Every structure is written in C-alpha cells, then in structure tokens.
C-alpha cells in the first residue's frame, strides 16, 4: 500500500493534527509506505497562476510547478485528506491543491474526438479517505449540501478506480466539543481507517 496523506490545518496543536497522527499510525500498522503533504508547513501556494492557467493543457509541462505533488499523486494507490471544514467547504489551501495538482493527463483525460467528456486518470487509486471537523451540526451541514465532502467523495472519487474503497468521518459541533466527544471521534477514525486499509481493528489512538 502506498498512501498519500494531504493534511491542511494552520495550528500544529489542533485536534485535526491528532486525527492526522492517528491516520498515519493506522497506515504504519497496516504496513503502508506513506508520504505526507502538510500544506501549511510546506507553505503551499493555493493560487493558480496566470502562467499555469495558460499552460494548463500542456502535458507533461503542466506538472512542473507542482512536480512533487504530481509525482506523489501518480505514485500512490491510497489518497487521504485530513482537514477542517470551513464555511461548509474545503480550506483555501486544500481547494488550491486540487486546482493546481489535479491536472489534465494526470487526474483526468480531456475530451477528444472519441470522448465528449473527461475520463478518470486516477484509476490506480483504490482507496480514498476523508477525515474532517465541522463547527456546524451534521443537520446544518447536510442542509447546505456538504460541499466539501461532495467535492472529495463524489468529484475526486469519480476520477479513481471504479471500485475505489472510501472512508469518511466528521466531528460536528467542534466549537462545543468535549474530551469525551473528541476521544469518541478518534475511535471512529481508527475504525474507518481499519476498514479502509483492510487491517484488523487496533486499539492504538492519538492523544486528544
């Protein structure tokens, strides 16, 4: 198993960091080779530049500005996102990562004479995990449409293998969370990771 974990949070001491640590621990337990992209620590620039836009369709030259991320996306068979939900969607850095890294001839194939729509390019990815926290309630998030979750588990998922296995866990109402609720969520994340990797259930958890 080759796992790429894309992590996005500005605070190294956040609860989201604890979720990341648990995800990494479960991958280690499953014997996975793992690469971590910490978007804040890496000072990832989310804005698609004019030059990138003008060269967007020029493959493989379009990979040059994000070469490491593109190589890691091409390398992995397991893709996991760990992030906070802000305004019901993805943080700007993570959305920018999708904009700049999910490129033509890498993440998808553009329409051509034989195909009227795009085709999946990430068919080597057979596992997709999404782990997030939300300030809003589950009901309100669903009422708005859960755009962040939909972007990843529907939009990105469509680019992956047809039988791509998925996992999702969200801690809602984070602003009123308690040690008990956070610990319970870590248990859910651990179980979701075990299902995603096919590993036997573990007792290992990251501290809250």
Regions found by a protein language model. Give the residues of each.
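Conserved residues at the C-terminal ends of beta-strands
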Residues: 82, 131, 172
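A structural motif corresponding to the C-terminal end of an alpha-helix
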Residues: 76, 82, 123-124, 156-164
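N-terminal beta1-alpha1-beta2 submodule of the flavodoxin-like/Rossmannoid cofactor-binding fold
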Residues: 1-106, 187-208
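Glycine-rich phosphate/pyrophosphate-binding loop and the adjoining helix
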Residues: 140-143, 147-208
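Short, glycine-/small-residue-rich phosphate/pyrophosphate-handling segment
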Residues: 109-158
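Active-site donor-binding loop signature of nucleotide-sugar glycosyltransferases
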Residues: 39, 133, 171
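Short histidine/acidic/glycine/proline-rich micro-motifs that form metal-
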Residues: 10-13, 85, 135-139, 173-176
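Short, structured loop/turn "capping" segments at alpha-beta junctions
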Residues: 104-109, 162-166
